[in-house]
């Protein structure tokens, strides 16, 4: 797969500016690294690969914040259509660190707002007045009510179609650590693919994934990571998806 990525046409961060898709429709898929190699091979002439810092597979660290009672987790678990997630994200290839608010509305669209913050505030931004004002203006939560919850690390491939109308992110080597319980977990060979578009429209990658029997699946890295690392949360909605990951990777993730 690495050789195929190196053979593809690249795209820079500057060129990506026109297709940030901060207000978008997301479609997620679950597969394995073995199948991913075939996906990348078939997409190699139709998509360009993001290159940052000379790398085409880039590392990301993310810290998800939540209330003491995991309100954002339960909003998702309880199928609330309008919900938010708040996180800090560190881009290891570029060195940038951002505070982000993701909002999903009842029409299935995702809007993301973010500001850059000092890297020292990755684990806590509450002392930063500008960051606190950002949270107050862009989210439904008070900064004082938020606490570090689930840390998530992964490696990502980002593809952009030649028409520059969509982006595809491929997250692998997913690992989680709960800051409250100290419990860690990994997803092994599992890969989460996310197609990001302005709306529901034709996409070459949808045909490639369908041909390889990779079907859409609604899945949240934060919720999966929380289920695997926080024994006290209710998890009934996510159990089926955890079992799907276990079956796909032949790895036991959760005690029965």
Protein language model regions, located:
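Phosphate-end processing signature that detects enzymes handling 5′-triphosphorylated RNA
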Residues: 1-256
């Amino acid at each position: 797969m690495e050789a195929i990525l190196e053979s593809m046409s690249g795209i820079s961060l500057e060129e990506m500016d026109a297709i940030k898709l901060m207000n978008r429709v997301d479609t997620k898929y679950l597969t394995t690294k073995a199948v991913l190699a075939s996906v990348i091979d078939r997409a190699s002439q139709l998509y360009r690969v993001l290159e940052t810092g000379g790398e085409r597979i880039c590392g990301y660290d993310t810290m998800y914040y939540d209330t003491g009672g995991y309100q954002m987790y339960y909003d998702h678990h309880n199928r609330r259509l309008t919900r938010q997630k708040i996180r800090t994200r560190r881009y290891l290839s570029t060195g940038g660190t951002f505070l982000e608010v993701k909002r999903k509305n009842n029409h299935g669209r995702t809007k993301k707002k973010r500001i850059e913050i000092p890297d020292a505030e990755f684990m806590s931004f509450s002392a930063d007045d500008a960051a606190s004002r950002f949270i107050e203006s862009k989210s439904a939560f008070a900064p004082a009510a938020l606490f570090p919850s689930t840390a998530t690390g992964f490696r990502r491939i980002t593809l952009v179609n030649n028409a520059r109308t969509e982006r595809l992110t491929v997250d692998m080597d997913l690992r989680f650590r709960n800051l409250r319980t100290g419990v860690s977990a990994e997803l092994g060979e599992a890969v989460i693919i996310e197609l990001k578009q302005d709306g529901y429209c034709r996409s070459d990658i949808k045909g490639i994934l369908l041909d390889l029997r990779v079907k859409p699946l609604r899945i949240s890295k934060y919720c999966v990571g929380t289920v695997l690392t926080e024994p006290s949360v209710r998890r009934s909605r996510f159990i089926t998806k955890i079992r799907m990951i276990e079956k796909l990777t032949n790895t036991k993730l959760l005690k029965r």
